[in-house]
Amino acid sequence: KHNLTNNWGIGYGISYRYAKDYDFQTYDNVSGNIKPENTEAGLNEQTTGFYFSLNKNWATGTSFSISATGEYYTIGNYHKWAVYPQASLTYLKGPQHIFQLSLSTDKSYPGYWDMQSSVTYLNGYSELQGTPGLRPMTNYNLNGTYILKQKYIFGLFYTHTSDYFAQTPYQATDRLALIYKNTNWNYMRMIGANVILPLSMGNWYDARLTLVGMQARQKCDRFFDVPFDRKKWLFIGTLDNSFKVGKNLSFELIGNIQTPFIQGTLDLASSFNLTAGMKWNFAKDRCSLTARCSDISNSSMPDMKVRFKEQYLDMDSGAYTRTVSLNFTYRFGGYKKQKVKGVD
């Protein structure tokens, strides 16, 4: 990176990454009617990138930056050229009003094991299949934010993910089997708004209310023999409360609720999470005792089902997500962190 005159700056670079992967799976002492096959496979992955950026800062606090990364990616027989742009703009109309606009792109890669042709049998009914040729997903994010009085936040967002992949269950039509398999979708798209509102009463109560509303669209033309194109509205609300009782005792209570949602052909039920905690400092602040219970109602994991075309499935994970923790800390008096000299 280089700093230029008048608060301009530029940056550039080049990168190369190579990875070689080898996976194998063998079975021994197999019982029942399952006839698994031993598998082995290797992958070579190469990524070459070129980067350039430009930025500018003004004395008023306004700033902007743009950048682009060109990439040539290859794995197995898959080759792709792509450009990933980034841009951000911050405009200050005084300290009480701040506007921000940003565009970002990133890439998520599947695990190497997910790209193999192996089959892992979870039990006599369920199996996990690999997906040779599974492609990375590319995510584009556009965000606009308005900050009022440096604490109230209002935002709009749009997200488009091409080649989105997720593990979705499928009931085979030619045999009695439930297949879990990562599949590239056409896209996953989300558009919505969010609000963050801090609340307070005197010196004893502080809270933050976060509200999110969005619509998601998920499309896949090649999901076995049941292609889907689904839309769903989602609303999320979180209230984070903090109570101070005197100087040394404080409590927290956090509630989160989420309306039903979708993942491919799956329908996810609503979920709720209530967490409570306490912190007590004593012995002249040398000792602290912290207690916390997360997911008190054990309802943060949503029930899942499939009611799509000829697919009919109920999934009950039986997950127990409630946790209780107790932590005690003692600080020895007079302790001072030693300074470490730098290497000459």
Residue ranges and their predicted role:
Residues L43, R135, I153-T210, K219-D240:
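Outer membrane beta-barrel strand-and-loop segments of large Gram-negative receptors
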Residues Y22-S31, I75-Y84, Y112-T120, Y125-E127, ...:
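Outer-membrane beta-barrel translocator domains and adjoining extracellular loop/strand segments
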Residues I14-K20, A68-G76, L103-Y109, V119, ...:
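Transmembrane beta-strands of outer-membrane beta-barrel pores
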Residues K1-H2, Q46, F50-K56, A87-Y91, ...:
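Residues on the lipid-exposed face of transmembrane beta-strands in outer-membrane beta-barrel proteins
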